[in-house]
């Protein structure tokens, strides 16, 4: 029966991220990557789903009073249960074709630091959205698998997964987590830091989407060698007279804005090294540290970490997709990786 269920359903793995949700279908790979956003039309106190994913993200910060755009995930876990369920249900229906006969089995990655209540909320959302069975896998393990790290070897490996809401620092050996710490610093905190910096330094208020564009275009974890670096024009609202304003921001300013979240990530890595058993720490010195997640793409972050730790730092080839790929591999090779998947209710 289990074999027939696998044949006639689209079993899937989901990276339920704060910023984006990625869906991996067994035997097909990653087939969907959309923003974790739901837009509602609100009338007489009743909500009706208007858009989910990319279309809903376009509405963030631009909605009239009757439309509400919500990000149901915050810092890697569900902040709005009902909205998360609507979003997951939409993505499952989009991927799970009506030609299949049974509900899909779904594995979802969760932050290592998620509480039992938060894990239960994710599992219940997935089951309510139409899964026949819901498994959970720790995000650091999924990230390491997706990055191709030899986590089942009897040696230490360190992975630093920088997502939208959290950064997970973990030391792995023999297929399990030896040490892990989750800090509430990620891409969203970096965007907030840019918004706050420009508000203080240039009296301009920009939206989250503009801050994200600045981060991805000229964001840097280190001061540029020439003291200025690349620059770009941005538009926002002048906080002095309230009118629209265009101004230039350069790489040095962005590096200054990001100094605090970057330092928090560096300190989390240093704490992990100090806490790791000596033999495993020696392995990490030999093999270096792997960066995954969208935050790993921040300019010169690997160099900043190398300067602070003295270790070799590598960025995974598909850092944005590592967690989804790793969760997908856990689905594909479930028998070999069953120790990493939690199906407990």
What does each model-identified segment do?
Residues 1-162, 170-290, 296-345:
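Nucleotide/phosphate-binding catalytic cleft detector across ATP-hydrolyzing
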């Amino acid at each position: 029966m289990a074999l027939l269920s696998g044949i006639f359903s689209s079993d899937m793995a989901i990276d339920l991220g704060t910023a984006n949700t990625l869906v991996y279908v067994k035997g097909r790979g990653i087939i969907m990557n959309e923003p974790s956003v739901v837009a509602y039309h609100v009338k007489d106190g009743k909500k009706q789903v208007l858009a989910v994913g990319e279309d809903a993200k376009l509405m963030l910060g631009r909605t009239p009073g009757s439309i509400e755009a919500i990000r149901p995930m915050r810092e890697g876990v569900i902040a709005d249960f009902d909205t998360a369920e609507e979003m997951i249900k939409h993505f499952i229906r989009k991927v799970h074709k009506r030609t299949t006969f049974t509900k899909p089995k779904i594995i979802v990655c969760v932050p290592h630091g998620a509480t039992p209540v938060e894990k239960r909320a994710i599992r219940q959302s997935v089951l309510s959205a139409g899964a026949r069975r819901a498994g959970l896998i720790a995000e650091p393990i999924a990230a390491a698998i997706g990055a191709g790290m030899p986590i089942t070897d009897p040696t230490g490996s360190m992975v630093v997964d920088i997502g939208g809401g959290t950064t997970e620092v973990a030391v792995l050996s023999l297929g399990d987590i030896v040490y892990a710490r989750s800090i509430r610093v990620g891409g969203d905190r970096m965007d907030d830091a840019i918004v706050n910096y420009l508000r203080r330094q240039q009296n301009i208020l920009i939206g989250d989407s503009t801050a994200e564009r600045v981060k991805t275009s000229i964001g840097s974890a280190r001061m540029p060698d020439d003291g200025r670096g690349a620059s770009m024009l941005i538009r926002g609202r002048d906080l002095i007279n309230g009118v629209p304003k265009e101004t230039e921001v350069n790489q040095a300013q962005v590096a200054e804005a990001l100094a605090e979240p970057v330092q928090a990530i560096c300190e989390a890595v240093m704490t992990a090294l100090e806490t790791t058993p000596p033999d495993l720490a020696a392995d990490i010195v030999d093999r270096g540290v792997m960066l995954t997640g969208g935050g790993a793409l921040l300019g010169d972050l690997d160099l900043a970490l190398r300067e602070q730790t003295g270790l070799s730092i590598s960025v995974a080839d598909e850092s944005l997709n590592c967690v989804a790929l790793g969760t997908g591999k856990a689905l594909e090779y479930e028998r070999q990786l069953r120790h990493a998947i939690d199906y407990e209710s």
